[in-house]
């Protein structure tokens, strides 16, 4: 994973954790948790691609990795929709910038996971 993506994740997570969105703070905490989970999943796929010989152990260790992959894409789509919704309803420029960057990062991560998964198939 390149260092720009790592710092982007860290920056967005830090800024999202500082936001106070009133009654929706539970939703925001859920988004933060999913962002962190997504980052870990993307990292593990990237590591598996780096050790392409690891493909067989990945498949035997987890016969349902394609199902997990599908689930992660569903989570990404949900996060994208949630971030777009937040972007539409917020008037705070700090939040708008944060959510725009989060959206961009989600789209990049989705593409990276697709690339990794095609290399593993």
UniProtKB/Swiss-Prot annotation:
Interacts with protein M1. May interact with host nucleoporin RAB/HRB and exportin XPO1/CRM1. Coiled coil: none annotated. GO terms for cellular component: host cell nucleus; virion component. It is found in: Virion; Host nucleus. Mediates the nuclear export of encapsidated genomic RNAs (ribonucleoproteins, RNPs). Acts as an adapter between viral RNPs complexes and the nuclear export machinery of the cell. Possesses no intrinsic RNA-binding activity, but includes a C-terminal M1-binding domain. This domain is believed to allow recognition of RNPs bound to the protein M1. HAMAP family: INFV_NEP. Pfam families: Flu_NS2 (PF00601). It comes from the Viruses. Average number present in a viral particle is estimated to be 130-200 molecules. Belongs to the influenza viruses NEP family. This is Nuclear export protein. GO terms for biological process: exit of virus from host cell nucleus through nuclear pore.
């Amino acid at each position: 994973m390149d260092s720009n993506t790592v710092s982007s994740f860290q920056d967005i997570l830090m800024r999202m954790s500082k936001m106070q969105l009133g009654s929706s703070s539970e939703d925001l905490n859920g988004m933060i948790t999913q962002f962190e989970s997504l980052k870990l999943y993307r990292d593990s796929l990237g590591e598996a691609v780096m050790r392409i010989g690891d493909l067989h152990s990945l498949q035997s260790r987890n016969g349902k990795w394609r199902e997990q992959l599908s689930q992660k894409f569903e989570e990404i789509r949900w996060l994208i929709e949630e971030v777009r919704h937040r972007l539409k309803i917020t008037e705070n420029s700090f939040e708008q910038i944060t959510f725009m960057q989060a959206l961009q990062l989600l789209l990049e991560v989705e593409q990276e996971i697709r690339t990794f998964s095609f290399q593993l198939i």
